[in-house]
UniProtKB/Swiss-Prot annotation:
Subunit of the peripheral V1 complex of vacuolar ATPase essential for assembly or catalytic function. V-ATPase is responsible for acidifying a variety of intracellular compartments in eukaryotic cells. V-ATPase is a heteromultimeric enzyme composed of a peripheral catalytic V1 complex (components A to H) attached to an integral membrane V0 proton pore complex (components: a, c, c', c'' and d). One of its GO terms (molecular function) is proton-transporting ATPase activity, rotational mechanism. This is V-type proton ATPase subunit F. It comes from Dictyostelium discoideum.
Length: 120
């Protein structure tokens, strides 16, 4: 597996509903690079799957992002992309949202860990 080098400052990217993204932005996570690319995407009922896919693909190829936080509800919409993603950096972390609790049985990272450790 090829390793990816990070730029000097590694960012956290966030994909989720307005409440989750706003919380991370208030904590100082939000950034815009020189090309005006943001490291977050607010997803609502009008956000197309294509827009979510584009943001995810963009975040996974950027050298300045080390972690992608994505609400599990949104992750379910692009589950096939997350399941196909095998790089260590950026790491994908599925998180709960206000209205949708976290289910470890759906989390790709948790499933990979269980498979590697042989636990159920």
């Amino acid at each position: 597996m090829a390793t990816k080098s990070l730029s000097e400052t590694a960012l956290v990217a966030v994909i989720g509903d307005e409440d989750v993204v706003t919380g991370f932005l208030l904590a100082g996570v939000g950034q815009k690079d020189k090309k005006k690319n943001e490291n977050f995407l607010v997803v609502d009922s009008k956000t197309s799957q294509a827009k979510i896919e584009t943001a995810f693909k963009s975040f996974t190829t950027r050298n300045d992002i080390a972690i992608i936080m994505i609400t599990q509800k949104v992750a379910d919409e692009i589950r096939y992309l997350i399941d196909e993603y095998h790089q260590v950096i950026p790491t994908i972390l599925e998180i709960p949202s206000k209205d949708h609790p976290y289910d470890p049985k759906k989390d790709s990272v948790m499933l990979k860990v269980k498979k590697m450790t042989g636990s159920d």
